[in-house]
Amino acid sequence: MGHKKNGHRRQIKERENQNKFERSTYTNNAKNNHTQTKDKKLRAGLKKIDEQYKKAVSSAAATDYLLPESNGYLEPENELEKTFKVQQSEIKSSVDVSTANKALDLSLKEFGPYHIKYAKNGTHLLITGRKGHVASMDWRKGQLRAELFLNETCHSATYLQNEQYFAVAQKKYTFIYDHEGTELHRLKQHIEARHLDFLPYHYLLVTAGETGWLKYHDVSTGQLVSELRTKAGPTMAMAQNPWNAVMHLGHSNGTVSLWSPSMPEPLVKLLSARGPVNSIAIDRSGYYMATTGADRSMKIWDIRNFKQLHSVESLPTPGTNVSISDTGLLALSRGPHVTLWKDALKLSGDSKPCFGSMGGNPHRNTPYMSHLFAGNKVENLGFVPFEDLLGVGHQTGITNLIVPGAGEANYDALELNPFETKKQRQEQEVRTLLNKLPADTITLDPNSIGSVDKRSSTIRLNAKDLAQTTMDANNKAKTNSDIPDVKPDVKGKNSGLRSFLRKKTQNVIDERKLRVQKQLDKEKNIRKRNHQIKQGLISEDHKDVIEEALSRFG
């Protein structure tokens, strides 16, 4: 890996923090042991790959020194002190003024309960009252961007590519509004939606709800990309995997299904509860999933191999919402209670979440923090990006809880910038549109896209098999040469266009399918006109003036 300088190879410096950047499969035996390889050219190539790998690991470890910010957690002064007993009032009095001011507490008792959703960069907050109150605001500056009183039931809302547009799931249809609250679109295809989400790299608005259908809508072109029937009744919970954009749906029979817009059937189905699934959360890396059900259970899954890490049975009350922060903190709401755990996503048995101090056992993962909304009920919760805050929407308003260590201390401003200007936001929108991924690229393993199919060599026919296939076809043609071809006078209805539309991909709506449907309608109109001419209803030179005027827009 090193460069030759003055006849010597430059040594690669090993870093103290290099271990956390090395692959787990890169063992000591694989580092330098290439003596068993007899091919000199292959051995030299393997050594070169090893040197490049060492250089990459050393460079990654060196850049870690340039990230001085670190996560700060609550630390007890002695073994008898428990962090979950610390109240929010004590934390506010101890932190700096700017952090204390971010502990938002809005009292909105008239239109609750409230559903909250933060923008991807954490700058804006979108609140949705069940009784029709919708508002978008810059919560850090205290500026209200848009406020709507829709006078009908609203269930959920989400921002689209940025805070300039947001979608609201209302009583029957889903609507899209701009940053001033002006209605832009009414999506008639999305009926009785209860859950909304947006895939930023594919520009897809995803909805699910009472109808049992999962629908993908491309907001850049306005086309309905796909509509999938879940066959599991109303959707109880929905979450997206940020790593591969696969949607996770929770159903009333206790199953969690994973969906891609290009597949009519779920990619994976797993049983997560003995009752309805109330909430689903997936961590930022896309490795772990947390679910909670009406059977008073909470389970944590490793979705790389779909194995269960931890299972907490017999919660005091059924969990209603679950969320995972960028740093791996797990938050659970049950009634008026909100409980958080640290290190709950680790594999060790000591990481299993539990309640209380468990008799002072130091090898138990007791709650990291807890909060009680007395006489209230939590509607939903979500961590604020890049902030040590947990947003909670409840029956009487919105509250931000200060949770030390919840936010990512070092962020990539080229990806998500919480301090972006108007010009940067516009450039970012253009950049994401140019780099928009097709809906067909959503799969369980995104690394498989562009790779070589190793099975193709075994599936491909060799020269001998091709010759035999050609010979069999010629012999069959000679044998049936005396059979005349039957050509009926009436054209059958089983045309190529109809057979294309009858394929199993009825749920996929693309440009080709729209062109085929348009061609079928055109042929149908021609046959209808010829029939009317034959019956003497119209003349051959008859022209429909209105139809010709509107045909230019077809």
UniProtKB/Swiss-Prot annotation:
Subunit-level organization: Interacts with snoRNA U3. Interacts with MPP10. Component of the ribosomal small subunit (SSU) processome composed of at least 40 protein subunits and snoRNA U3.
InterPro entries recorded: BING4_C_dom, WD40/YVTN_repeat-like_dom_sf, WD40_repeat_CS, WD40_repeat_dom_sf, WD40_rpt, WDR46/Utp7
Source organism (scientific name): Saccharomyces cerevisiae (strain ATCC 204508 / S288c) (Baker's yeast)
Lineage: superkingdom: Eukaryota
Keyword Nucleus: yes
Protein name: U3 small nucleolar RNA-associated protein 7
Region (Disordered), start-end ranges: 1-39, 475-496
GO cellular component: 90S preribosome; nucleolus; nucleoplasm; preribosome, small subunit precursor; small-subunit processome
Miscellaneous remark of the record: Present with 5800 molecules/cell in log phase SD medium.
WD repeats: 108-149, 230-269, 272-311, 314-351
Biased composition (Polar residues): 24-35
Disulphide-bonded residues: none
Main location: nucleus
Free-text function comment from the UniProt entry: Involved in nucleolar processing of pre-18S ribosomal RNA.
Skewed-composition ranges (Basic and acidic residues): 13-23
Keywords: Nucleus, Repeat, Ribonucleoprotein, Ribosome biogenesis, rRNA processing, WD repeat
Feature: compositional bias, Basic residues: 1-12
A biological-process GO annotation: maturation of SSU-rRNA from tricistronic rRNA transcript (SSU-rRNA, 5.8S rRNA, LSU-rRNA)
